[in-house]
């Protein structure tokens, strides 16, 4: 199977800072004085992780909170760069990494559809042609013309996934943003992801819901303590993970 995601010996580090200022005025007027880089101190998000994902595969990243799953998705999506190693992808990548990502809080849901869909590679005419399908999928009703600053987290998830549902990516990347939606909408999203898979779209996503992983995924990548622990079939890795978490 031809790999369309190649994650090769990737390490991502972030510098650590500590607060040495005396109060909020220092933060506003003297930010350089208020924060000081802890020389030599870094946070290691992931370390020497390698994996590939083949064209048309559905793969889940699992692991404890803070293990490095979301960092890995961000690297594949291209929103962050590795400290070491290389990350390459082939084709159009559509990602939903955080609630409200790619949206402007002062714009309405409808206006944000134009904004987000454009960021995902659709032309304005294509957005217009798909607008009603996006709105119908979102189930937001009259709220579609309200500014999204009044939206709940569940409504933001609905809007974001509704746009994703109408793009035509080669690679679909989803962090665990679906967990905030209602059960019926979650089921609709899972079915949409399965439909993407049937059409040959490559899927990489993070989930703590092993039932969803089993429904969608061919393989699972288990990240533990910022390193790759296991890669294998969904059934085998999920069983190992459940045993480790027990």
Curated annotation (Swiss-Prot):
Binding site for ATP: 63-70
Family designation: Belongs to the ABC transporter superfamily.
InterPro entries assigned: AAA+_ATPase (IPR003593), ABC_transporter-like_ATP-bd (IPR003439), ABC_transporter-like_CS (IPR017871), ABC_transpr_TagH-like (IPR015860), Bact_Polysacc_Export_ATP-bd (IPR050683), P-loop_NTPase (IPR027417)
GO MF entry, a single one: ATP hydrolysis activity
Entries under CDD domains matching the protein: ABC_KpsT_Wzt
SMART domains with a match to the protein in the record: AAA
Protein name: O-antigen export system ATP-binding protein RfbB
Major site of localization recorded for this protein: membrane
One biological process term in Gene Ontology: polysaccharide transport
Native organism taxonomy: Bacteria, Pseudomonadati, Pseudomonadota, Gammaproteobacteria, Enterobacterales
Subcellular location: Cell inner membrane
Domain ABC transporter positions: 22-246
Keywords: ATP-binding, Cell inner membrane, Cell membrane, Membrane, Nucleotide-binding, Polysaccharide transport, Sugar transport, Transport
Cited SUPFAM superfamilies: P-loop containing nucleoside triphosphate hydrolases
Membrane-protein topology: Peripheral membrane protein
Its job: May form an ATP-driven O-antigen export apparatus, in association with RfbA.
């Amino acid at each position: 199977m031809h790999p369309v995601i190649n994650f090769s010996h990737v390490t991502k580090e972030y510098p650590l800072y500590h607060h040495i200022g005396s109060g909020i005025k220092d933060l506003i007027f003297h930010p350089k004085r208020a924060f000081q880089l802890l020389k030599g101190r870094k946070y290691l998000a992931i370390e020497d992780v390698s994996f590939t994902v083949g064209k048309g595969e559905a793969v889940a990243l699992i692991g404890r909170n803070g293990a490095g799953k979301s960092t890995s998705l961000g690297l594949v999506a291209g929103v962050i760069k590795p400290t070491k190693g290389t990350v390459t992808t082939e084709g159009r990548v559509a990602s939903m990494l955080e609630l409200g990502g790619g949206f402007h809080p002062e714009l309405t849901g409808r206006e944000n559809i134009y904004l987000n869909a454009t960021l995902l590679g659709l032309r304005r005419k294509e957005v217009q042609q798909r607008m009603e399908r996006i709105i119908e999928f979102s189930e937001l009703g009259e709220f579609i013309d309200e500014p999204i600053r009044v939206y709940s987290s569940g409504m933001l998830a609905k809007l974001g996934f509704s746009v994703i549902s109408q793009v035509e990516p080669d690679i679909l990347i989803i962090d665990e943003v679906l967990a905030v939606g209602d059960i019926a909408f979650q089921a609709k999203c899972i079915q949409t992801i399965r439909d993407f898979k049937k059409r040959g779209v490559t899927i990489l996503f993070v989930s703590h819901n092993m039932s969803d992983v089993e429904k969608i995924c061919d393989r699972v990548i288990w990240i533990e303590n910022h390193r790759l622990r296991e890669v294998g079939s969904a059934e085998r890795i999920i069983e190992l993970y459940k045993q480790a978490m027990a």
